[in-house]
Design a protein with these regions (language model features):
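Structural signature of the Rossmann-like NAD(P)-dependent dehydrogenase/reductase core
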Residues: 12-13, 98-101, 128, 149-156, ...
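Active-site loop of short-chain dehydrogenase/reductase
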Residues: 7-8, 64-65, 92-93, 143-157, ...
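Catalytic Tyr-X3-Lys loop
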Residues: 94, 114-134, 152, 175
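Catalytic loop of short-chain dehydrogenase/reductase
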Residues: 102-106, 114-118, 149-188, 199-201, ...
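Amphipathic alpha-helical dimer-interface segment in Rossmann-like NAD(P)H-dependent oxidoreductases
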Residues: 101, 123-147, 159, 183-184
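C-terminal helical subdomain
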Residues: 195, 212-289
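Short-chain dehydrogenase/reductase
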Residues: 2-90, 104-112
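Conserved Rossmann-fold SDR core element
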Residues: 27, 92-93, 176, 186-201, ...
Length: 289
């Protein structure tokens, strides 16, 4: 679990709960020191529970070292300070997981976008899309210095089909394109950038949906645990040939099969390609500088 006698280091943004929390804990189980960011420090601040301190403790309990850092990803100075701290305390960065997203409940209503609060769209583009660029910007020099670094964007099929309106679609499509274009800049330095499509994930919100009616029980059968993608990310980081997939949007369930990773109770979650007949966009290989 070490590399050159140094613990491997990851930063996971948006890790108070949900997918980010699961990814951070999974990386901890692989021996990573994980800096986990979020805004929630006190129990009860969010109706969905969870704090960055709780996540950090779970990372440590899983076998890694959890470091909670309160970061508002709308504040670029706080993001810059995060990576300055990682440099000072660790001297390296192996993985950045861009997961932070500010999703209002109103965004998921069936109304047309103009009948939803404007903040529901703008906030997601700020903390979700823009925040991924800013975090990658400040992480890049440290990743390049470390060598063989990995940048991950957590994404979803909403990148290529309608879901929750144009802001959500632009968010997911933008993350996938971030991975594609950052890969071009990172390639000479051996750093990999990928986007990973998640399936249905057993987050706090999804569990509430499943519990709301027996007809929704099928979701539990196909859902991924929040930790599932974290194990996929750890496998990617350990793969000596990972640069071959740099720039791609990966379907997490398919990558898991390739690496022999199963989820709870030995399950193999279905690919969204199978569930929804969707696949990531294909980008032209032309590079213009």
């Amino acid at each position: 679990m070490t590399d050159g006698q140094q613990a491997r280091v990851a930063v996971v943004t948006g890790g108070s709960r949900g997918v980010g929390r699961g990814i951070a804990i999974a990386l901890g189980s692989h021996g990573y020191t994980v800096y986990v960011t979020g805004r929630t420090r006190t129990t009860g601040e969010s109706p969905w529970g969870g704090t960055i301190g709780d996540t950090a403790a779970a990372i440590t309990a899983a076998g890694g070292k959890g470091v909670p850092v309160r970061v508002d990803h709308r504040n670029d100075e706080e993001v810059a300070a995060l990576f300055a701290r990682v440099r000072d305390e660790e001297g390296r960065l192996d993985i950045l997981v861009n997961n932070a997203a500010l999703i209002h409940d109103e965004l998921q209503s069936p109304l047309p976008f103009w009948d939803k609060p404007l903040a529901a769209s703008v906030d997601l583009l700020d903390v979700g899309l823009r925040s991924g660029l800013v975090a990658s910007y400040y992480a890049a020099p440290l990743l390049v210095e470390t060598g063989r670094g990995l940048v991950v964007f957590t994404s979803a099929p909403g990148a290529v089909h309608y879901q929750y309106g144009p802001a959500y679609g632009a968010h997911k499509a933008g993350l996938d394109k971030f991975a594609a274009d950052m890969a071009v800049d990172f390639r000479p330095f051996g750093v990999t950038a990928v986007s990973i499509w998640l399936g249905v994930v057993l987050t706090e919100r999804v569990k509430q949906i499943i519990d709301s009616g027996p007809e929704l029980g099928y979701l539990d059968d196909i859902a991924e645990t929040p930790e599932f993608t974290g194990h996929v990310i750890a496998a990617l980081a350990a793969d000596p040939d990972v640069l071959a997939v740099s720039g791609r949007t990966l379907i997490g369930a398919e990558a898991a099969r390739q690496y022999g990773i199963s989820d709870r109770d030995g399950r193999h979650p279905p690919s969204v390609r199978e569930l929804m007949s969707v696949q990531p966009a294909t980008y032209h290989g032309r590079i213009r500088r």
